């Protein structure tokens, strides 16, 4: 069941963001060194959203229709997507006016609860590959094609914890981005 009913125009707009169905890495669990490119089929997206709804309900959080729509568009995006791109897609899919602050509040919710990440370099958003697992990740950003891969390894968390303890620094957010050229573009 798809709760986000897109109009024909918004479907055309979103087609550029739809990833290929066979590029999803179902084995990635961030338990050891791993890299993940989150690209999901429609069925996987529906299962992911159902799980997130269930998790939010269990935690007493509201996963509103707008939050779901924003999250769905981010899951559909083949590359990181900006807030105003999301706003444009939402506007084209709705008869109502969607105000930028409501989109930003939805993005803040998704960020705060680990469902999406925001790249510091481009301010664009993309879905977390393991939203139910708390982890510190680095992001490999290709300068040629714009692809982003999420990378996680236990040593990243260990190193950051050691730095925090040795400097008595209370970290509030961590964004690690490596910019370069992906294997496909080399």
Kindly give the residue locations of the regions a language model identified.
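Short capping segments at the starts of secondary-structure elements
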Residues: 77-82
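Basic amphipathic alpha-helical segments that dock to polyanions
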Residues: 103-113
């Amino acid at each position: 069941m798809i709760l986000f009913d897109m109009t024909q125009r918004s479907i055309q707009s979103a087609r550029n963001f739809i990833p290929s169905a066979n590029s999803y890495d179902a084995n990635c669990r961030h338990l050891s060194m791993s890299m993940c490119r989150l690209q999901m089929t429609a069925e996987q997206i529906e299962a992911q959203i159902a799980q997130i709804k269930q998790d939010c309900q269990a935690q007493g959080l509201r996963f509103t229709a707008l939050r779901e729509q924003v999250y769905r568009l981010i899951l559909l995006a083949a590359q990181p997507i900006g807030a105003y791109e999301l706003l444009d897609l939402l506007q084209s899919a709705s008869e109502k006016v969607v105000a930028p602050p409501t989109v930003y509040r939805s993005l803040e919710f998704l960020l705060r609860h680990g469902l999406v990440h925001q790249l510091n370099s481009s301010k664009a958003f993309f879905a977390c590959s393991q939203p139910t697992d708390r982890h510190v990740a680095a992001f490999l950003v290709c300068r040629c094609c714009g692809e982003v891969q999420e990378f996680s390894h236990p040593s990243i968390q260990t190193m950051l914890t050691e730095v925090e303890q040795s400097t008595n620094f209370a970290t509030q957010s961590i964004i690690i981005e490596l910019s370069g050229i992906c294997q496909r573009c080399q």
